[in-house]
UniProtKB/Swiss-Prot annotation:
HAMAP family: FlgH. GO terms for cellular component: bacterial-type flagellum basal body, distal rod, L ring; cell outer membrane. It is found in: Cell outer membrane; Bacterial flagellum basal body. This is Flagellar L-ring protein. It comes from Chelativorans sp. (strain BNC1). Belongs to the FlgH family. Residues 1-18 form the signal peptide.
Length: 235
């Protein structure tokens, strides 16, 4: 029985090890194709529609989209690019303490005398019941985040109410480590600045991800077998 269990455990470990890719052994992580960041959930690069030609009034040198003389044109159509400024400096600290104490005591007594003929007897009973509970709890949470990044995003969809859906990905490979920055969300055209930039706090449904993959990330993560045991073991 022990041999069967050991064999099954070994086969399970080999199966999980087979899930890991061996294509990047001895090679740095590959970069994603250009355009795939416009649709993070898609497996292929996003294809943008052809830009419609802006209407130019007769005898006019300027189109409606290029009519700003002192500012850059803003992103308004699918395929346009805008710059997202991410500046996060959040700090949070929580401290909770609770204490509860309860004590109860009960005393019960019983005494009696009886006589039968010349025999006399007595009976006594006494009982003490006591209980007590005490609970003390404390908790503290402290978090500090500081992130300052700039990324270019592209307009992937224009909603019926005029809002824009944006998405962008930036990848930087240093040696064998690939750092990936991803941004996605909904933007109101009125919040886009004159220089075609927008701050992250003005993006609704914002999804910001900053991480990476490569040799350092693999070393920092526990092996698949350990992750499996941490999940299934009750102790």
């Amino acid at each position: 029985m022990n041999k069967i269990a050991g064999t099954l455990f070994l086969l399970a470990g080999l199966a999980m090890a087979g899930c890991t890719t061996t294509e990047e052994l001895g090679k740095p992580p590959a970069l994603s194709p250009v355009g795939s960041g416009a649709e993070p959930t898609a497996m292929q690069a996003y294809h943008y529609p052809d830009r419609r030609q802006a209407h130019v009034s007769r005898y006019s040198l300027w189109s409606d989209r290029q009519s700003r003389l002192f500012t850059d044109p803003r992103a308004l159509e699918v395929g346009d690019i805008l710059t997202v400024v991410i500046s996060i400096n959040d700090k949070a600290k929580f401290e909770n303490e609770s204490e509860r104490s309860r004590q109860a005591t009960r005393n019960l007594g019983l005494a009696g005398t009886f006589a039968i003929g010349s025999a006399t007897g007595s009976a006594e009973a006494d009982a003490d019941i006591g209980s007590g509970t005490s609970t003390v709890g404390s908790g503290a949470t402290k978090r500090s985040e500081d992130m300052r990044l700039v990324i270019a995003a592209i307009v992937t969809e224009r909603l019926p109410n005029g809002n824009l859906r944006i998405s962008g990905t930036q990848e930087v490979r240093v040696n064998a480590e690939l750092r990936v920055l991803t941004i996605a969300g909904l933007v109101r055209p009125a919040d886009i600045g004159p220089n075609n930039t927008i701050s992250y706090e003005r993006i609704a449904e914002a999804r910001i991800s900053y991480g990476g993959r490569g040799r350092l990330t693999e070393v920092q993560q526990p092996p698949y077998g350990q992750q499996f045991l941490d999940t299934v073991l009750p102790f």
